[in-house]
């Protein structure tokens, strides 16, 4: 969903370039992301971080991990970064990229990222837009290029068609997962929901009684 532009967004991002890295700067940061954090720790990336509820929640819950939220919409990334800054200041383990998630290998080198999150991505339902889905094979190639051997992609969605499509895409690419890392109704499973950090969309769909599909797949 495209957000209405906020008049303050551009100036705020420019004033907080230590927190939000633009796409151009991100490509220059390849292999050096640990320098932007307080200390070297595993890096987890959310592609399509929206207004940032998930990535902020994860950064607060896991100070032992460095998190990067990647978002293409200026308004969304500005809202996310300002919200976290206003709530808790500059977190030592949270940064954002204002840029396109297409081609993450231009931002990170091999094994620089430990894990990738895809949360409630645009389903792009029309067949002619298949290549835009974040679980399409070319995206999987990009993820594999920055993750370590057997690196993990965690995917959540409310869209059954996109979930089924993604399962097939993962399988065709040779990815694998344990039966315990797969669910067709996340919030109906007391064990699987432990440690789950909800996104804004997740809360919205839960309120409507819609099931949330989730899988953690490995290369």
Swiss-Prot record:
The enzyme's E.C. designation: 2.1.1.33
Domain of life: Bacteria
Top-level EC class as recorded in UniProt: transferase
Residues binding S-adenosyl-L-methionine: 46, 71, 100, 122
Entry GO CC: tRNA methyltransferase complex
Keywords: Methyltransferase, S-adenosyl-L-methionine, Transferase, tRNA processing
The keyword tRNA processing is annotated on this UniProt entry: yes
Catalyzed chemical reaction(s): guanosine(46) in tRNA + S-adenosyl-L-methionine = N(7)-methylguanosine(46) in tRNA + S-adenosyl-L-homocysteine
Family: Belongs to the class I-like SAM-binding methyltransferase superfamily. TrmB family.
UniProt protein name: tRNA (guanine-N(7)-)-methyltransferase
Organism, as annotated: Leuconostoc citreum (strain KM20)
Lineage of producing organism: Bacteria, Bacillati, Bacillota, Bacilli, Lactobacillales
């Amino acid at each position: 969903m495209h957000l209405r532009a906020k008049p303050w967004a551009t100036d705020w991002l420019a004033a907080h370039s230590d927190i939000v890295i633009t796409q151009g700067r991100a490509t220059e940061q390849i292999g050096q992301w640990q320098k932007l954090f307080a200390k070297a720790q595993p890096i987890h990336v959310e592609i399509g971080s929206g207004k940032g509820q998930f990535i902020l929640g994860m950064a607060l819950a896991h100070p032992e991990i460095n998190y990067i939220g990647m978002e293409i919409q200026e308004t969304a990334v500005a809202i996310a970064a300002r919200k976290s800054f206003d709530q808790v200041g500059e977190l030592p383990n949270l940064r954002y990229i204002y840029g396109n998630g297409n081609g993450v290998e231009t931002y990170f080198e091999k094994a620089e990222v430990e894990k990738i999150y895809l949360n409630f991505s645009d389903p792009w339902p029309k067949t002619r837009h298949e290549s835009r889905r974040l679980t399409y094979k070319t995206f999987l190639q990009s993820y594999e290029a920055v993750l370590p051997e057997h690196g993990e992609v965690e995917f959540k969605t409310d869209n059954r068609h996109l979930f089924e499509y993604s399962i097939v895409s993962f399988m065709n690419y040779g990815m694998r997962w344990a039966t315990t890392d797969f669910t067709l109704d996340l919030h109906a499973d007391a064990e699987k929901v432990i440690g789950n950090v909800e996104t804004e969309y997740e809360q919205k769909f839960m309120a409507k009684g819609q099931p949330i599909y989730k899988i953690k797949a490995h290369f």
